[in-house]
Amino acid sequence: MSIILDNVSYVYGQNEGYIKQALKDINLVIGKNEFIGLIGHTGSGKSTMTQILNGLLVPTTGNMYFEGLDTKEKNFNKKELRQKVGLVFQYPEHQLFETTVFKDVCFGPKNMGLSQKECELRAFEALTMVGFDSELFY
């Protein structure tokens, strides 16, 4: 897997009259099997860049390429990108959206297209692996 950012910029509020440049002319290559971390002050563009890398935002200018494909193309498969690029939100409470821990952990496998039974099996294994008592699952 490779990701290339080519002169990527992102501006918030461009159509509303409130303009805030979050990223400007970012060039980055993330090669196969590489991991990156982003650090910086509040408002420096970390969350914006992460959302672009995950396909949640599209660059205002410039291009992002995943496996050589331009992510702005109409037929680009964002699901495949999101299966390969992980995202942890800045505020953990924003990433929980189910009514139980078990259902929340099932979301990832379900989003990958696995059967309900396989999702539940994987969630059970993952929660058990990290030491959750099965009484807390439901």
Task: Specify the residue positions occupied by each region the protein language model found.
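A short, flexible loop at the N-terminus of ABC-type nucleotide-binding domains that lies
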Residues: 1-2, 11-25, 74-77, 116
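The feature captures the beta-strand-to-loop junction immediately N-terminal to the Walker
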Residues: 39-41
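Helix-to-loop junction immediately C-terminal to a conserved catalytic motif
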Residues: 54
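Conserved ABC transporter NBD signature motif
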Residues: 62-73, 81
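Short helical segment in ABC ATPase nucleotide-binding domains corresponding to the A-loop/adjacent helical element
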Residues: 93, 102-110, 120, 124
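Conserved ABC ATPase "signature" region
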Residues: 117-136
